[in-house]
């Protein structure tokens, strides 16, 4: 397997985007941790904590939906279409997350604490996927007989 394999990296990113929000939502950690992200307001009322949980769940389900799209691209498309759709999906994902976090920060959103080594995976896999898809933008499908 070559390093710049669009199918592999799209499946890796799609799995990352699908599995982790699902685990966080099902385990209850999304709801339990949500008020801490708005710590700049001090202690939240029950209603405010519920609203914070809804924001976190919606954000997580948005990531999950993008993960399913990325998995679909990885499984159903062939190069160069897969590479081109992969670039669009990865750029779209990055822009949506930057806009979401940036907009929420204007309203006092503090975000998650430092994630340590896990942050390398969360940032590295999509970044490698973007680079791989960009490198393979004009690739040709090789038919072996």
What is each residue range found by the language model?
Residues 1-23, 138-139:
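Cytosolic juxtamembrane helix and N-cap/initiation of the first transmembrane helix
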Residues 15-60:
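Hydrophobic transmembrane helix segments
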Residues 17, 61-71, 125:
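Core segments of transmembrane alpha-helices
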Residues 55-63, 116-125:
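Alpha-helical transmembrane segments of polytopic membrane proteins
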Residues 68-91:
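Juxtamembrane helix-break-helix junctions at the cytosolic face
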Residues 86-104, 122-128:
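Hydrophobic alpha-helical membrane segments
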Residues 99-119, 136:
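Membrane-helix boundary connector in multi-pass membrane proteins
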Residues 125-144:
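Membrane-water interface at the C-terminal end of transmembrane alpha helices
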């Amino acid at each position: 397997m070559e390093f710049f394999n669009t199918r592999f990296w799209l499946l890796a990113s799609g799995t990352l985007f699908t599995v982790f929000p699902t685990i966080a939502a099902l385990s209850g950690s999304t709801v339990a941790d949500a008020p801490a992200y708005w710590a700049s307001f001090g202690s939240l009322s029950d209603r405010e904590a519920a609203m914070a949980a809804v924001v976190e769940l919606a954000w997580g389900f948005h990531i999950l939906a993008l993960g399913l799209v990325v998995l679909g691209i990885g499984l159903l498309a062939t190069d160069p279409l897969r590479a081109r759709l992969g670039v669009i999906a990865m750029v779209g994902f990055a822009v949506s997350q930057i806009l979401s976090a940036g907009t929420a920060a204007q309203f006092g959103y503090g975000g998650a604490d430092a994630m340590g080594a896990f942050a390398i995976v969360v940032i590295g896999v999509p970044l490698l996927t973007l680079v791989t898809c960009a490198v393979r933008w004009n690739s040709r499908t090789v038919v072996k007989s």
